[in-house]
Amino acid sequence: MEYINTLLALTGVMMLSVASPGPNFMIVTSTAVASRRAGVITGFALGAASGTWALIAIAGLGLIVTHVAWIGTALRIAGAAYLIWLGAKMILTARHPLNAPTLVAPSGWTAAKKGYAVSMTNPKAVAFYGSIFALMVPAHAPAWFHVAVIAIAVAVSSAWYCGMALLASHPAVHRLLMRRKAVLDSVVGGLLIVLGGRMLAAR
């Protein structure tokens, strides 16, 4: 019963974590504007990344980052560089219409890679899985509990972000976002650059 209660608590914490806006939310909604399919694939990729982070947390991410300082620094710099690059790319292509020959909806593989990379370099993920999440997982829990934790991380994240992709690509919402594509991409790109800059400035 103790393990079941812990799983329920972890599920609640996971739901609060994915619901808070951040790079993951920005990338899935902006991708869904270009293509519903690509947006949903991005959502599943974010879910896969959550499962990866859960596995890393179970393996002792918090202890590693705490005792080997350069690993945390390297993760922060890599994440910041990727977010800045992605943000700059979005701003540069913000005014390109989606039906232009030079710009097409991302392929499934491209959407999956982008979603996974954004989540794996997301500072929120490092902080969440390296601290709160890792602390909530009992040290000597059985194997089935660890499997359940990873499954919950994948399920909660996939459900939320795929839901956001479907919402953003709903005809009414999609038309509104398409009319504001240049503004949306510029704002999201700018926010990603700001997030990356804050990561670089952090100590």
Regions from the PLM with identified roles:
Residues 2-73, 131-148, 152-153:
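Juxtamembrane transmembrane-helix termini in multi-pass membrane transport proteins
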Residues 67-96, 156-164, 175-203:
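Selective transmembrane alpha-helices of multi-pass membrane proteins
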Residues 55-58, 121-130, 188-203:
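Hydrophobic alpha-helical transmembrane segments in multi-pass integral membrane proteins
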Residues 45-52, 112-125, 184-188:
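Select subsegments of transmembrane alpha-helices in polytopic membrane proteins
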Residues 8, 12, 105, 109-117, ...:
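Alpha-helical membrane-protein architecture signal
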Residues 15, 19, 51-52, 88, ...:
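Hydrophobic/aromatic residues within the transmembrane alpha-helices of Major Facilitator Superfamily
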Residues 92-110:
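Flexible cytoplasmic inter-helical loops of multi-pass small-molecule transporters
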